[in-house]
From Swiss-Prot:
Pfam families: DUF359. It catalyses: 3'-dephospho-CoA + GTP = GDP + CoA + H(+). Pathway: Cofactor biosynthesis; coenzyme A biosynthesis. It is an enzyme of class 2 (transferase). Catalyzes the GTP-dependent phosphorylation of the 3'-hydroxyl group of dephosphocoenzyme A to form coenzyme A (CoA). This is GTP-dependent dephospho-CoA kinase. InterPro entries: GTP-dep_dephospho-CoA_kin (IPR007164).
Length: 168
């Protein structure tokens, strides 16, 4: 069983790890495109409605994505039709439920949009742990930055955050 619940040190999860791009789209997407091209990134995983929408809008299609249909800015986001398959899961705030974990396992193998009933934020951690080599996980930071995590370089360090999660 793979289910995790945030139990302490929420502040560590709000930190802008490690490549924070403080630019608006389309420039922020161009920076990620440069990262992808320069370092041989083969898979892109996006977490968040606005991030996923911007990647599709500016022609840097993610391999898979996780969205929850909500944005901090209150914008209505249409369901992207780019993905081959959609998986719907329940994942409350501060959790990575077992069904969400299983959906991420499938998403790193195929072109999947995970539609979350609840909150998708913590799924970035599941993507970082499960993504294959030569991947980048990208999500929006609540203060406005685009966060890009090349998993080959940062997976081990960021997966230490699992120490602050309890199994559920």
């Amino acid at each position: 069983m793979t289910c995790f619940k945030l139990c302490c040190r929420r502040d560590l999860f709000a930190f802008p790890y490690p490549v924070a791009i403080w630019k608006e789209p389309p420039r922020s997407i161009e920076v990620v495109r440069d990262l992808v091209e320069s370092y041989g990134i083969e898979q892109i995983y996006t977490v968040g409605d606005i991030v996923t929408t911007n990647f599709l809008k500016y022609s840097l299609a993610p391999t898979s994505a996780a969205v929850d249909g909500k944005t901090r800015r209150g914008l209505k986001i249409d369901k992207p039709t780019f993905f081959r398959k959609t998986i719907e899961v329940y994942n409350p705030p501060g959790y990575i439920t077992e069904e969400a974990w299983i959906a991420v396992e499938e998403a790193v193998r195929d072109n999947v949009m995970i539609k979350v009933n609840g909150e998708e934020d913590m799924l970035s951690l599941a993507f970082i742990k499960l993504a294959p080599p030569h991947s980048v996980v990208v999500y929006g930071h609540y203060m406005g930055a685009l966060i890009a995590i090349p998993v080959d370089w940062y997976r081990d360090a960021i997966c230490k955050l699992f120490e602050y999660l309890e199994k559920c």
